Amino acid sequence: MYVEEVEAGARPIEGVGTAVAAFVGFAGRGPFNTPTLVSNWAQYAQTFGDFVEGTYLGQAVYGYFLNGGGNCYVVRIGGERDDAGTGGGPSGNGALPSGATGVLGGYKVTAKAIGAGDITVEVADAAGENPAEDRFTLLVKDAGKVVETHHVTTKRTKENVVTVVREKSNLITVEELANPPAKADRGAVALRADESAPTAVPGKVAADDYVGDVADRTGFGGLEAIDEITMVAVPDLMSAYQRDQISLEGVKAVQLAMIAHCEQMGDRMAVLDPPPALNPQQVRDWRQNVAGYDSKYAALYYPWVKVFDAAGDDHLFVPPSGHMAGVWARTDAGRGVHKAPANEVVRGAVALQTQLTKNEQELLNPIGVNCVRSFPGRGIRVWGARTLSSDPAWRYLNVRRLFNYLEESILSGTQWVVFEPNDDALWARIRRTISAFLVNEWRKGALFGLTPDEAFYVKCDRETNPAEAIDAGQVVCEVGIAPVKPAEFVVFRLAQFSGGTSLVNE
């Protein structure tokens, strides 16, 4: 008797992630031009420092997490790429500022980057009762606050202080001196920055700093190597504009490059900010006559939102892109990517730079300006879900993002097809696999139709795969879907009858 395993039926397709943002801007510390994965605000603060006055990257990332965002990538610009991750200065040589090295407990301690305050490293007693003499606790403080705690030993084990710090610390490195002691002396050392330390905001900024280069992995050009990103925002483009470091033409050049990047990748959206302090007529003129963007891979939000400024202990207006990306992520998690990310509360926003009326909304919405509005008793809400495309087929943001999701999921879930025999059996398996995935999406409400036949079709047969295509090594599958679209306007028809009663039809 023999047992033979035979594959049968459809192979399941797993939906890809739809809410991974990428932010490009200025930070107090951290590696330059290196896309760094960040999963929460604590990780961001540990790697890139806290809020920096005069910049918007920290506020955007904080607003993203506050509004429901998950993983994101952060790219710090303002200096040349430092492959060692030490946060080299604008000169790009990766040199640490003088005074950023000290000796503690028989070890040489070096700061990877200096934040807004001094970095202090302390050797403290090990936790627990009667610890071994070789064990101790290494505390790393930034501006007096403990940000890293390492339980280590002087012995050459996997818990050796040099090994642990190298693997886990984002702020310091530790090296053994000539004769490392068996017991680390208790004490502390401050790694102070001086005037030569790199600043969060460079003295000179150009459009190329944001755009970067794909080959050198700089700017948002370096994001091409990360396939999972679905949104791109550059909040500090506006901080440079406010400091007159970049002109309005430079702003347009960077945003056009963002759009081109997203169109080329085909799986992500550019979340754009307008210039600050524009009234509705000015933003309409900027959208139509100055910027003139036309892309199904970009969305624009207006106006700026007012948030609490932890750096200045006050309130300030910030570009909305970070908060909007968080709203996208929250909507995807709660309702699905097919739901338009609108009519959602903007968490953390206490006011708006411009209070919009219904008539102003009707002026801006048709040209693709997604308004953020304040409603009595309902808070500050996103009140638009359009792309910047002039093509009615791609007018709605959720339609474009749904197609991105379906395309990426099907492409990823059918990699097993490559090098399979290109025959009727393969085509049937492809049809079953994709149909099963789309039926599941239809049941979630992502596709329009009372039945699966009304919602989509999958065609993979001799018609889509003639002999010429087979000889060329191609297998072609045609998929058509009917996406759901948002109800932007609700119309009520009221009729009055002579009897005094009325009928309302929705």
Label every PLM stretch briefly.
Residues 181-211, 216:
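Long, low-complexity, polar/charged, intrinsically disordered or flexibly structured peripheral segments
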Residues 93, 176-177, 194, 198, ...:
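Generic N-terminal simple sequence motifs
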Residues 173-174, 183, 192, 271:
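Intrinsically disordered, low-complexity regulatory regions of eukaryotic regulatory proteins
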Residues 115-119, 186-192, 434:
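A broad "ordered helical/assembly scaffold" signature
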Residues 1-104, 108-116, 127-133, 137-146, ...:
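Structured, hydrophobic secondary-structure cores that serve as assembly/anchoring elements
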Residues 94-98, 118-124, 144-169, 173-178, ...:
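Short amphipathic beta-strand/extended segments with alternating polar/hydrophobic composition
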Residues 83-84, 94, 143, 161, ...:
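Short linear motifs in intrinsically disordered/low-complexity regions
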